[in-house]
């Protein structure tokens, strides 16, 4: 909070305040970074090039004005998160000690007034704890500490497009350079922004394997990541999401089941958006 915020430095309790102002005190006071980016994106809106072909920022008006920041596609939401994190990362003030280890992207109660939908839209994970691409982007940049301790690379989005599609490919990486390969053929090295983002413009889609290889300053490979074109939908895959202690049949526990449409090789089909019908039998309530 802004009003009287400097007086908060002398209190013993955890309080709400700006991280850039208080990180020098966070060695002794727990802090949660929550509002460094309030942009939102609905999971099913991957990008403008694949189903359902949602135009970036298109959505209902808010008080007669465009609500672009609340109707992002997944690729642009991840890019925005990278840019916002970089603003903090390049400064990273503080004591020099390990005092900042995590952040929280909360769901705002005003979301349903600005975005096309409500809770499914907010956050880098949704209300069901399913990760969005922005989550994996954060994982690359901020895996436990603000300075890189584990080199990682991640390709934003999927690799399933109509024939003749030409689009940019974005890669988030801790390396100094990133080279992109399509079915083993090099497409060159990406343009670097915000330290972690590498963009490859005008990539022509061909089914197969899209792979990003990251290099350090010495030109040595330090990490790689690949995505593959999924085949035709073949089956449903159900995965239980539970705590380390497992489920408790005590009448109070909740069961979360993630449902995926997969091809014959078990690879997720990211663009299959058909309605799924469920039935439930046994001692449980839907």
What is the predicted function of each stretch?
Residues 191, 235-238, 278-286:
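Short aromatic-acidic-glycine turn motif
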Residues 171-172, 214, 252-269:
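Beta-strand-rich structural segments
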């Amino acid at each position: 909070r802004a009003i009287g915020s400097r007086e908060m430095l002398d209190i013993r309790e955890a309080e709400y305040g700006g991280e850039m102002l208080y990180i020098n005190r966070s060695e002794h006071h727990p802090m949660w970074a929550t509002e460094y980016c309030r942009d939102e994106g609905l999971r099913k809106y991957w990008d403008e090039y694949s189903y359902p072909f949602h135009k970036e920022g298109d959505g209902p008006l808010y008080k007669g004005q465009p609500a672009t920041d609340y109707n992002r596609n997944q690729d642009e939401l991840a890019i925005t998160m990278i840019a916002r994190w970089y603003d903090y990362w390049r400064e990273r003030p503080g004591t020099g000690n390990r005092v900042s280890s995590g952040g929280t992207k909360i769901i705002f109660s005003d979301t349903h007034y600005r975005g096309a939908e409500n809770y499914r839209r907010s956050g880098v994970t949704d209300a069901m704890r399913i990760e969005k691409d922005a989550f994996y982007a954060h994982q690359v940049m901020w895996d436990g500490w603000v300075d890189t301790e584990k080199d990682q690379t991640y390709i934003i989005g999927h690799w399933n497009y109509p024939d003749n599609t030409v689009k940019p490919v974005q890669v988030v990486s801790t390396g100094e350079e990133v080279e992109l390969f399509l079915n083993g053929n090099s497409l060159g090295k990406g343009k670097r922004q915000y330290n972690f983002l590498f963009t490859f413009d005008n990539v022509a889609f061909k089914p197969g394997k899209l792979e990003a290889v990251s290099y350090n300053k010495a030109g040595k490979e330090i990490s790689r990541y690949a995505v593959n074109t999924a085949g035709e939908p073949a089956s449903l895959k159900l995965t239980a999401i539970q705590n380390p202690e497992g489920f408790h049949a005590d009448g109070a526990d909740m069961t979360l089941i993630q449902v995926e449409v997969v091809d014959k090789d078990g690879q997720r089909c990211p663009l299959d958006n058909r309605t799924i019908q469920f039935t439930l039998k046994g001692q449980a309530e839907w």
